[in-house]
Amino acid sequence: MKITVLGAGSWGTTLAMLLANKGHEVRLWAHRPEFARALEADRENKRYLKGVLFPDNLRVVENLHDAVETAEMIVTAVPSHALRETAAAFAHLPLDGKIIVNVAKGIEQHTGKRMSEVLLEALPRIAPEQIAVLYGPSHAEEVARQQPTTVVACSVSEATARRVQEAFHTSSFRVYVNTDLIGVEIAGSVKNVIAIAAGISDGLGFGDNAKAAIITRGLAEISRLSSKLGADPLTLSGLSGIGDLVVTCLSQHSRNRYVGEQIGKGRKLDEVIGEMSMVAEGVLTSKAVVKLAERLGVEMPISQAVYEMLYENKPAPQAILELMERDPKPEHY
């Protein structure tokens, strides 16, 4: 299969290598032409995955139109805030029969829309059945080294999800299918916000009890929001739900947990973001989640506290104290 991956960050590069190693004809597009040329010349991504060499059947390209036009499947691996602009740049090309697989996890800040909804708006000539997402607990650093990983391919069309499953499934990268696109996308996006809270707990020096509470009550927030939007509650017990939430809250590779840890230590958001070479999606997603929750009347106190610590400079100890001193409630409401 001819597959194009848009976005040459750590995750896009990793997936391009995985697909090429499986035998697909793969093109990896980088937004900056000079970066694309360096990748093609070096045959590795020295910035994000140093030491992992590209397979021979992986080509790095500069021309977006050529890369998209010849592809049977297009994997969008750009940051969530850049997805609309990137998709709009190839919206005029023939897309009949092509599958668009989004792997960025986020909610668009100014619209509150999920990534599949953004794609449908930016690519008005494609059908919902052409869109899928690939989500789950899958840090690029481990996938690139072929360590065992499981994810979920999700689309409103089971046939589309199965095609994605067939394209990506390997002996080290196990792919399941799901058709609950709302649940998979909401869980995969909001978990980044909860991971920032988990990192803040680490930065404050709290222990396992606090981390377990954040993960569990964070899952409750994800459940309330996704249920309000019509998701299947069972999705949250799967890979894109509790699976991705746990790994993002605990892993040393988690950029969102790292941001939270630095905030918990008293550093300013701009300073932390400025020193990072990769995107922590939860920073922008926290804004979108708070707006969406307010509009839908969904209570999400942990997400709200993260927003206040990131954007209103609320001291982390004060935010945690306010969470603990909220009125007592039933566990499930």
From Swiss-Prot:
Keyword Aminoacyl-tRNA synthetase: no
GO CC, any one term: cytosol
Listed pathway(s): Membrane lipid metabolism; glycerophospholipid metabolism
Major location category of this protein: cytoplasm
The keyword Cytoplasm is annotated on this UniProt entry: yes
Binding site for sn-glycerol 3-phosphate: K105, G136, S138, K191, D244, S254, R255, N256
Entry's EC annotation: 1.1.1.94
One Gene Ontology term from the biological process aspect of the record: glycerol-3-phosphate catabolic process
Keywords of the record: Cytoplasm, Lipid biosynthesis, Lipid metabolism, NAD, NADP, Nucleotide-binding, Oxidoreductase, Phospholipid biosynthesis, Phospholipid metabolism
PROSITE patterns the record matches: NAD_G3PDH
Active site as annotated: K191
PANTHER family in UniProt: GLYCEROL-3-PHOSPHATE DEHYDROGENASE, GLYCEROL-3-PHOSPHATE DEHYDROGENASE [NAD(+)] 2, CHLOROPLASTIC
Function: Catalyzes the reduction of the glycolytic intermediate dihydroxyacetone phosphate (DHAP) to sn-glycerol 3-phosphate (G3P), the key precursor for phospholipid synthesis.
Family designation: Belongs to the NAD-dependent glycerol-3-phosphate dehydrogenase family.
Protein name: Glycerol-3-phosphate dehydrogenase [NAD(P)+]
Organism: Chlorobaculum tepidum (strain ATCC 49652 / DSM 12025 / NBRC 103806 / TLS)
